[in-house]
Amino acid sequence: MKTTKERLAAAIQTPLKDSLAFYHTSLKGLDQEQVEENRDLYGENTITKGQEDSIFKKIYESIINPFTIILLVIAFISLVTNVWLAKPGQEDPTTSIIIVVLVLISGGIRFVQELRSDKATTNLSKMIVNTATVIRDGLEQELPIDELVVGDLVKLSAGDMIPADVILFESRDFFVQQSGLTGESDAVEKLALNKATSQNIESLLEAESLAFMGTNVISGSATAMVLAVGDDTMMGAIEQTLNTYDEPTSFEREMNSISWLLIRLMLVMVPIVFFANGLTDGDWLEAGVFALSVGVGLTPEMLPMIITASLAKGSIIMAKEKVVIKKLNAIQDLGAIDILCTDKTGTLTQDEIVLEYPLDIHGDLDMAVLRRAYLNSHFQTGLKNLMDRAIISRTEKESKEHAILQDLDKIFQKIDELPFDFERRRMSVIVKDDSNVVSMVTKGALEEMLTISTHVEYRGEIIPLTEDIRQEVLAEVGQLNRQGLRVLGVGYKSGLREDYAYAVTDESDMILTGYLAFLDPPKPSAAPAIQALLEHGVKTKILTGDNEKVTQAICEKVGLDVEHMLLGADIDQMTDQELAEAVESVTVFAKLSPDQKARIILQLKKNGHGVGYMGDGINDAPSMKVADVGISVDTAVDIAKETADVILLDKDLMVLETGIVEGRKVYANMTKYIKMTVSSNFGNIFSLLVASIFLPFLPMAPVHLIVLNLVYDLSCVALPFDNVDQDFLKQPHTWEAKSITRFMVWMGPISSVFDILTFIFLYFIIVPLVTGHHYVHGSESALQFIILFQTGWFIESMWSQTMVIHMLRTAKVPFVQSRPAWLVILMTLVAAFFVTSLPYGPLVNILRLAPLGLPYFLFLICIIFLYMFSVTVIKKFYIKKYKEWL
């Protein structure tokens, strides 16, 4: 069978009827039997995004990471020293076995969590389906893109994403944006096979009659036959041969920064602990194992799992709120925005545009204006927007009473069209009536219509467009705009040639016949939603292509500041510095092109803001791409949905507010884990360093450190489900390694102070009370003394680490002003009591622990309560100094 490139190259040189026959199809499309045969022969229309990981690879990646490698190295060293090099009868593989079991438990939890996350993401993705209009068995039908097969006939129009590599056999002013494949930013016109001027090209991408998967239809329409699907397409080939690089998000950058912070800290502390213990005790091998254990203790091994669980939980909650998170990280990015940019249509307004008035130039109702507007909207092949639909709907309604509006699609025949673009802000159709009179009918923004008109029509009389008439029209339209009505102008000219290739330059010397006034009222929820966003630290800015008067009227009704409004023309005259200042004070921007919208968003980002952009049209895709979070709706055009990070199933700002709050909850609970764990572990390591210098033995066995670390991490598994203070949700937050370092340096030494107090009490009071004597190096009772000491600090460390979670998880007074989730309470208590029970259970000899008496537990209660009180006091000083907590 020929390769895909050979088939594409052959298709542009082959008559259409021969290509149809080759793929066993016809102008009626494939039948179901042939669909299955072509699918078996040419494959499915899905691109392999790299080979899916096997279950074994997922298990491997869940278990093996830099931290577990260190653990396994410790296990290996312990195996060598305690088994292979041990004297006969003294072999003890306990430490190695415990470490391996702990690694497997940690990896198993992460593996299960990753599987749940993957499943949730897959289920959410299935909620958003891009479709294509396909002709099969002579009928047009909407099918998911992945159901297309080679030989299918597809209908394409403005706003569509090309669903496969296709060859055009019908086209009408069909322009495609294929910068993703070629790098060229300008739209390219594609022609039907029989109209292509030259097929002698160096690259298939230059072929005028070929369009490729993943490119976007900017304007016009076409009918095409699918030539290649899935991995066989140009896009599929690129996916298979290139490792695409996505620029890391701010979240990913800060996670990397935190990781390097921990690595640097570990590189400093581990050698110090190693030399301190080696010089004190003289056992360098044991000192090495202990130092490596310290390194493990300093790192939050469960961080990847906590992050995944938090993001997945947020995504699942948002799905219940009719918000689909396409990328897990987007939920956190959504919580970090402090500016939401959005078009007003369908967001502030009800998205149900009604044509209120078809008016002549003096503002009187005129069905002749509606007649011409209908011709323009009905016969255009581009994307019919809400106003086109409103025109068609009003015409169908009025045609029952007005003969002038009846049978227009039979009276008129379309000759040509000039599609809409965002520079001209208008579109034209050329039609011929049953008297063979050829006319151009143009509809567009009134200001643009006035620039191309030389005459006006009033009650059948055509007169020159004078300055007085122009001002009268503008005054009338201004009045309508102030009422919140959107206005389009309608013009025409007749007596044109049929056999002529019309161009944009022919939109001249037009006769302005009237205008159309549309009503798109604000949503009742718009004003409270904007206020709710503001209360959560998110300012709403309107970026619209509509004119300033309509925009002003709508924005005033929903409570937005319209005193300072910027227009697209103003922005073009501004330097970057001037725009940087303007975007801070201006709330409403009108008459913008897509490029101007993107420029505003980029400037806001340069100013240090987290920016979300919400849109649903072709012109919104560039803005969504440059924003920190691109937001769209399930009814948006394909390219908008493809570009978006977040898709709303309900186009309502109230839903977004919920998403932003949920994103901040995700951030809060991840931050809790990182700050708590890093500061707690730092305190433990500082305590170990002090103990290593002053104690004649290890304050805790390596296996104790590892068990302590894992049990603590398991208790933190509940943190993604913790409650978050309402005050914290009022403002956006960003990741800062500096903030984490500061928190660690402040809170870590506090735990060290109480650890050192514990050392003193254990060494001089509690352990001597139990053993009846003080520590004497080399004596028969020395081992018992060491085991009791290590047990005492082991239990105290667990209680201090788990109980302080409740102090650190909130800036408020815990349990009184801020209550943790019941699962957090349960997990911390289970962890603390589990470790406390170990000296009294079956693992006592394996872990080398020993029971402690009542004096120890009285001391433990006092030291833990004193520690919690001290943390609460220091917390108030910290918040007062730095104006933050988490």
Regions found by a protein language model. Give the residues of each.
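Membrane-embedded transport module
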Residues: 273, 277, 304, 311-313, ...
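Acidic, divalent-metal-coordinating active-site segment for phosphoryl/phosphodiester hydrolysis
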Residues: 527-529, 535, 547-558, 595-603, ...
